[in-house]
Amino acid sequence: MRIDLVVPCFNEEDNVDEFVKVCSSVFDESEFSYRLIMVDDGSNDATFSHLTDLAHKNPCVEVIQFSRNFGKEAAMIAGLEASSGEYSAIIDADLQQRPEDALAMLRILVQSEGEYDCVAAYQEKRKESWLITKMKGMFYSIFAKAARSQAIPHASDFRVFTATVRDAIISLPESYRFSKGIFAWVGFRVKPYAYVPSDRLQGESKWSLSSLIRYAFEGILSFTTLPLRFVTYLGAVTSIGALLYAFITVLQILVFGKDVPGYASTLVVVLLLGGAQLLSIGILGEYLARVYMEGKQRPLYIVRSRVCSEVSDE
């Protein structure tokens, strides 16, 4: 049996050599054959040069180079489309996700004898700040309710799965891909696997707080119509509030004979309605933009080159 490990790489020149070394030492001693599908996501450092040298020396390494940076989601799908083993895995190149855990997850999947289709890793102890941890927890809770999908809380893209799951993931044609939502949407039987991430070998994480927030919004917009329902609810609440205010105003004038000053209240109402309208238009625009981009049917990525070993692995 063979497992194909898909490894997205972006500016990982300081990590890829050690990653391949560790991964090879782990799987060379295992009962499985393996292949490392290293996807260079338009790196602007020497990542591709390092990967090319590794591919020429190691028959288990295959390299896919993008024409530019298309993002991790595109890198993952490119690697999965190149995968043909009985099992596939997604793992980062910075060794925070250990190859030893990938092997343990594979063994759990194989030994389940069909009981599970996927083993998904989640962080048992998080090393992030309290704020980011809480924000991620809130996101998973909102996403699970809004998208009606059972996403494993704090699960990463680090997982091992069968060819059937891989084919199901590849079959989804959308351009705006949100892997955590896709993994949850395709379903199958998933076994959670707790792990503690190691310290990053070299460099810094590519994820900032702003990029995490943007990624969360992408997930919500890609997998649920909750924001559109929010617009509907906002319109209903605003209409009810306006009717109540009109009723109270008429009551004060006709019954109590009060002179209701209108300038300040009118200004507040106009600003409130204007803000609600702009918010609604913005949400509708986000969905319309996605329809527009999906209609273009552009490829998720463009491959500049592929590199395989000149040495046979037979």
Task: Go through each PLM region and give its residues.
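Structured catalytic core of nucleotide-sugar glycosyltransferases
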Residues: 1-130
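Residue-level signature of catalytic and energy-coupling elements of molecular machines
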Residues: 5, 23, 79, 94, ...
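Short conserved micro-motifs on helix faces and helix-strand junctions that flank
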Residues: 8, 66-68, 159, 232, ...
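Alpha-helical hydrophobic/aromatic positions enriched in membrane-embedded helices and signal peptides
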Residues: 32-33, 37, 86, 154, ...
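Acceptor/aglycone-binding surface of glycosyltransferases and processive sugar-polymer synthases
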Residues: 64-68, 72-82, 87, 99-182, ...
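Hydrophobic helical membrane-anchoring modules
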Residues: 178-314
